[in-house]
């Protein structure tokens, strides 16, 4: 997911999942640093501000880890910018660039006079990286975990993929069937399965807002300027008042019309996985598209079995990752 997010952003492939000739893998420093940022950010919500600010001044504990992580991420951003510059020759892209027809996000910012400040540019790029990597990379394990517990739902998804697969020609005998974004676009049930996962396991489980001025909430609570409001999206997705008595069940049909052919309207302020209103995630449809193509390709080509004995639980972090990872067995399907 790190490479998937970085390639369209920087116009170059970091190659974190590539192997060298000695079969060793490149260091995952930047990816690990992002995990640290999210974990320390969560810790800041659990302890008094005076405590973490003191640790920051003394450069100890979690704040020391955060400072190191920021250094790693800044170095990564600088390296990617330099690498992007190398593959641009006389204003033209060379063969190593991301796409001959589409400009990568980094290039658009470099050409924007409002982003001449390197610190601002680094901050914006890393924000894109965090959002692009974590939304997809965090959600997919939960998607496959839920689907593995519900084989009937997997059967429905495969039945909807079947007519699409019958029209596609595999690259070679025995090759995997790869689904493209256009193939999965009409699959509303698959989208519903993703949304149902995000309801129960939102990639960002908490939403933090700072009050700008004195106001009274619709609930009647008075808030003052400077107050911090924490919204638990994880809890909201499991509230009976919002989602009904079966709120803890994994049921994609709850997102569909009675005939199952269209997606039912659900207000964004009720389903905040992609935020709401003017702050709704601009990359929402891109993230959904990428997840649909990945899930469709995996489910069509493989049976996914969860390895027994592992403890499935979330990590204490601003991102709802699986604490112990997710181990599965993939068995090639006989098609």
Give the label of every model feature segment:
Residues 231-261:
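Conserved cytochrome P450 K-helix/beta-meander segment immediately N-terminal to the heme-binding cysteine loop
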Residues 151-153, 229, 284-321:
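Cytochrome P450 heme-binding "Cys pocket" and the immediately downstream C-terminal segment
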Residues 135-148, 294:
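Short, small-residue alpha-helix embedded
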């Amino acid at each position: 997911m790190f490479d998937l997010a970085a390639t369209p952003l920087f116009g170059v492939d970091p190659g974190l999942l590539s192997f060298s000739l000695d079969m060793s893998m490149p260091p995952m420093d930047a990816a690990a640093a992002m995990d640290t940022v999210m974990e320390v950010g969560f810790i800041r919500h659990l302890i008094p501000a005076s405590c973490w600010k003191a640790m920051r001044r003394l450069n100890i504990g979690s704040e020391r880890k955060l400072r190191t992580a920021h250094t790693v991420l800044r170095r990564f951003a600088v390296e990617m910018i330099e690498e992007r510059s190398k593959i641009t020759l006389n204003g033209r892209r060379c063969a190593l660039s991301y796409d001959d027809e589409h400009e990568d996000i980094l290039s658009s910012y470099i050409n924007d006079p409002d982003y001449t400040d390197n610190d601002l540019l680094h901050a914006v790029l890393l924000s894109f990286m965090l959002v692009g990597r974590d939304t997809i990379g965090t959600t997919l394990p939960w998607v496959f975990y839920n689907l593995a517990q519900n084989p009937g739902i997997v059967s429905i998804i495969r039945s909807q993929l079947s007519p699409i697969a019958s029209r596609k020609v595999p690259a070679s005998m025995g090759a995997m069937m790869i689904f493209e974004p256009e193939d999965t676009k009409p699959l509303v049930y698959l989208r519903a399965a993703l949304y149902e996962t995000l309801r129960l396991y939102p990639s960002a489980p908490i939403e933090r807002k700072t009050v700008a001025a004195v106001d009274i909430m619709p609930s009647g609570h008075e808030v003052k300027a400077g107050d911090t409001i924490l919204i638990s999206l994880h809890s909201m997705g499991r509230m009976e008042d919002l989602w009904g008595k079966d709120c803890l069940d994994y049921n994609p049909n709850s997102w569909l019309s009675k005939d199952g052919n269209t997606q039912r309207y659900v207000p964004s302020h009720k389903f905040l996985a992609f935020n709401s209103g003017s702050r709704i995630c601009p990359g929402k449809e891109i993230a959904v598209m990428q997840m649909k193509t990945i899930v469709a390709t995996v489910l069509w080509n493989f049976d996914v079995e969860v390895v027994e004995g592992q403890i499935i639980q979330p990590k204490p972090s601003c991102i709802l990752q699986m604490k112990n990872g997710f181990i599965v067995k993939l068995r090639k399907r006989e098609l």
